[in-house]
Regions:
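Non-cytosolic head/periplasmic domains of membrane-anchored proteins
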Residues: 75-159
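Surface-exposed amphipathic alpha-helical segments
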Residues: 168-202
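Extracytoplasmic/periplasmic/luminal assembly and interaction segments
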Residues: 33-91
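A mature extracytoplasmic/lumenal domain signature
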Residues: 38, 152, 175-177
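Extended hydrophobic
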Residues: 156-172
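Alpha-helical transmembrane signal-anchor/signal-peptide segments
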Residues: 11-28
Length: 202
């Protein structure tokens, strides 16, 4: 009986993180193979066509996160842990403006004229106050093809969005702004995640 129970237990809850079960899903008529344990929304944890899939991965391992620990009275006062995850969303774009085109044609209308060079080829340009992106900054490394739109640190830490289009779907990655101090590593991680999600079933 114990063996039967083990075999019937959902694979996303028991598969080792080093080799998670993968689900073939179609988003925007584009095939992706996603680790079941990385799917954040239970109703999205199935194969076949979907409008959107929301995922999370630990960084820098890029493995699905472990199941959250149950919070009790003895743990609720513990210090909040730093974010160590990349959140990813795959959504059908329905022929909306591509992310790279938005960077070229939309964002410049709302950016300040001056830019600030940062470490290792990264540039920062602030969005003007009173615009749709007021209170945010655009980070770009043109030679590396890296762009991220980020909120600023306030009551909560700033977060960044990096987007890319894959055929009929847009991938949106979210990660802490503080990670930009090692932006090349983050950019490489996003490239690897994209390749993994587009990889063959296995």
């Amino acid at each position: 009986m114990a063996l039967v129970t083990y075999l019937l237990w959902p694979s996303w809850g028991t598969s080792p993180s080093s080799s998670p079960a993968r689900l073939p899903v179609s988003v925007g008529a584009t095939l992706f193979n996603v680790p079941a344990a990385a799917v954040r929304v239970k109703i999205q944890r199935h194969s076949g066509p979907q409008e959107r899939v929301d995922l999370s991965f630990t960084y820098p391992s890029l493995e699905p996160p472990e199941a959250p620990k149950r919070v009790g009275a003895d743990t609720v006062e513990e210090k909040v842990q730093p974010i160590d995850r990349i959140f990813a969303s795959i959504a059908a774009h329905h022929d909306s403006l591509a992310p790279d085109a938005r960077v070229r044609t939309i964002y410049p209308r709302y950016l300040e004229q001056t830019s600030t060079p940062l470490d290792d080829g990264l540039m920062l340009r602030a969005f003007r106050d009173g615009t749709p992106y007021g209170g945010e900054d655009l980070f770009a490394a043109t030679a590396a093809g890296f762009n991220a739109r980020c909120t600023r640190d306030a009551a909560t830490p700033g977060m960044c969005l990096a987007e890319r289009r894959i055929d009929g779907a847009d991938l949106t990655f979210r990660f802490p702004r503080s990670w930009l101090s090692r932006w090349r590593e983050v950019a490489g991680a996003l490239d690897r995640l994209t390749a993994q999600l587009r990889g063959s079933k296995g």
